[in-house]
């Protein structure tokens, strides 16, 4: 996979302020405020920064946490995991492997078959419905 590298200025021009804050600044949107936390349409969720397909609606579930939650990514190689020790906690941060965009965190409290909960910020995603329509947070 070829990495996408852009300058800070290029990312700022491409992304909304909220998308930049979340994906490039490792921010977190408030729960129950993101566009996709309760989306139930069939489709694919791609990285808002580089367009890499990351998650499918088939793996999405309602965890009750207020963020889009998935029990698995489309392909584990599309997600990079790093230890995050911010906010006096130890968590596992998830990033897009192609462009290093911060997506959210993964927790070991999800449903079977993986037991994992990929808790993802809506601002880091763009949704492509199965019928071909793309929905973006800044529309």
UniProtKB/Swiss-Prot annotation:
Q: How is the cofactor bound?
A: Binds 1 zinc ion per subunit. The zinc ion is important for the structural integrity of the protein.
Q: Which reaction does it catalyse?
A: L-methionyl-[protein] + [thioredoxin]-disulfide + H2O = L-methionyl-(R)-S-oxide-[protein] + [thioredoxin]-dithiol
Q: What's a GO cellular component annotated to this UniProt protein? A: cytoplasm
In alphabetical order, the GO MF annotations are: peptide-methionine (R)-S-oxide reductase activity; zinc ion binding
The record's annotation in Pfam families points to: SelR (PF01641)
Q: Which residues form the active site?
A: 119
Q: Which GO terms describe its biological process?
A: protein repair; response to oxidative stress
Task: Give cofactor(s), names only.
Answer: Zn(2+)
* Enzyme Commission number(s): 1.8.4.12
InterPro entries xref list:
Met_Sox_Rdtase_MsrB, Met_Sox_Rdtase_MsrB_dom, Mss4-like_sf
Residues at which Zn(2+) binds = 47, 50, 96, 99
* UniProt KW keywords: Metal-binding, Oxidoreductase, Zinc
Domain MsrB: start-end pairs = 8-130
Q: Which NCBIfam families match?
A: peptide-methionine (R)-S-oxide reductase MsrB
* Similarity remark: Belongs to the MsrB Met sulfoxide reductase family.
Which HAMAP family does this UniProt record tie to the protein?
MsrB (MF_01400)
Q: What is this protein called?
A: Peptide methionine sulfoxide reductase MsrB
What species is given as this protein's source? Hahella chejuensis (strain KCTC 2396)
Tell me the gene name: msrB
């Amino acid at each position: 996979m070829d990495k996408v590298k852009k300058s800070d200025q290029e990312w700022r021009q491409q992304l909304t302020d909220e998308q930049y804050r979340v994906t490039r600044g490792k921010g977190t949107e408030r729960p129950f405020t993101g566009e996709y936390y309760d989306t139930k349409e069939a489709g694919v969720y791609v990285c808002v920064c580089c367009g890499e397909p990351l998650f499918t609606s088939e793996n999405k579930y309602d965890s009750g946490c207020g963020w889009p939650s998935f029990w698995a990514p489309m392909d584990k190689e599309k997600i990079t995991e790093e230890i995050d020790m911010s906010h006096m906690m130890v968590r596992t941060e998830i990033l897009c492997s192609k462009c290093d965009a911060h997506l959210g965190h993964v927790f070991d409290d999800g449903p079977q078959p993986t037991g994992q909960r990929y808790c993802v910020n809506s601002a880091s995603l763009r949704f492509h419905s199965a019928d071909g329509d793309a929905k973006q947070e800044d529309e």
